[in-house]
Design a protein with these regions (language model features):
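Active-site-proximal polar cores
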Residues: 1-21
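Short, conserved turn/kink motifs that form compact alpha/beta structural patches or helix kinks used as
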Residues: 19-102
Length: 102
């Protein structure tokens, strides 16, 4: 594994007044391996409203269902996963029409 990724999840917390709010929780940098997006994957992602950007593979035990990742300094949606034994493939993309605010 020759690259790193940060996985992001949300948790709902309560403040002192009992109001609920969402807070982001980021993992430490995790080792991953960069794969490639096939033409078929790109097409399927596009039909689902995503622009496919990357496929990364990491150890299955490092993944806990997060829906967002930070890869090479940019935030991506995890729009699909595929388990391969002890590893899992995460497919990263952006929503079609979404403007990057970073």
């Amino acid at each position: 594994m020759n690259d790193t990724i940060i996985l992001v999840s949300e948790e709902t917390l309560k403040d002192d007044t009992g109001q609920r709010y969402k807070s982001e929780v980021q993992t430490d940098e995790l080792l991953c391996e960069l794969g490639s997006i096939t033409r078929s994957e790109w097409s399927q992602a596009n039909q689902a409203g995503y622009e496919a950007e990357y496929e990364v593979e990491l150890f299955f035990l490092d993944y806990a269902g997060q829906r967002t990742a930070i890869f090479h300094g940019k935030r991506y949606a995890i729009y699909r996963t595929y388990r391969r034994g002890e590893r899992i493939e995460l497919y990263l993309g952006t929503r079609v029409g979404e403007i990057d605010a970073e």
